Amino acid sequence: MAVRKPPITTREYWAPGHAACAGCGCATALRLATKAFSEAMEEKYGDPNAFAIAQATGCMEVVSAVFPYTAWKVPWVHVAFENAAAAASGIEAAWKKKGIKGKILAIGGDGGTADIGLQALSGMLERGHNVVYLMYDNEAYMNTGIQRSSSTPYGAWTTTSPPGKYSIGEDRPKKWVALIAAAHMIPYVATASIGNPFDFVKKVKKAAKVDGPAFVQVHCTCPTGWRTPLEKGIEIARLAIETGMWPLFEIENGDIWHIKIQPPGGGAKVYKEGGRVVRIEFKKPIEEYLKYQGRFKHLFKRPEAIDELRNQIKAMWKVLGVEAILPKPEE
């Protein structure tokens, strides 16, 4: 009888028993990422354990390493909110000096990456360190009290962007750090989502195998900060892809003229010219994604705000070289 090989290694580097919230999408992301990293190290260096982690303060640090306990089954160091990339750079330099084969994984949330740690990240990428930076993006400072970050989407409620008579909630467009990383002309940049775990695993493995720096921005649901049902995390993340809210793409060697766009699914029609995706007609409206989330519920009383969000998404896709057709619910 044939035995089917598991789609990913059964080795575990993120142990159960950590303190993450029930339904935490970021915990899922880190478990998958470390598995994928292990596979890449085994394929490249013959050693599945040939990696170490430098992790910034944030949700996943706090829930995984409350002294004297840890959920990590790999060499791991907790560093400050702003310097995961800098610490990873130092570890990588030490490994190079000592002749240690392997790769360093730096991990930070959207606050520690898009805001506080952006300078350190830029320096790491520009210097060409052999490090993969994984940004888990749950779109706010969830660990410290659900405060807005520059990665918070337009219109979202947070404790520092509360909607009201004179406020729509978050009033700035989302910052796409992946595009900033690509501007450094590094070997590999990608966006991913727990809503498409196989794509995520493939991209982490690809990032881990390149020589030089790589950056992966993964979209993670947060039931606590997003006010969503615990059991719908993967479904909601998938809806972000299928409605156009979260694009899946790859940029290699800073070549923004040849961005590789992954099809969103959900019945969307994808049109190509010369092998490049140039137009996507989405079937599902963004309201399908918004309706499950308490952080967006006030927008349904302000349809003009949803239209503004829709326009911002179209503008983001235009930057990627794609004309996005986003339907309204009645269409």
Swiss-Prot record:
Q: Broadest EC class?
A: oxidoreductase
Q: Where does [4Fe-4S] cluster bind?
A: 21, 24, 59, 222
- rRNA-binding as UniProt keyword: no
- Domain of life, per lineage: Archaea
Which keywords has UniProt assigned to this entry? 4Fe-4S, Iron, Iron-sulfur, Metal-binding, Oxidoreductase
What interactions and quaternary structure are annotated? Heterotetramer of one alpha, one beta, one delta and one gamma chain.
Q: What is the name attached to this protein's record?
A: Pyruvate synthase subunit PorB
* Annotated gene: porB
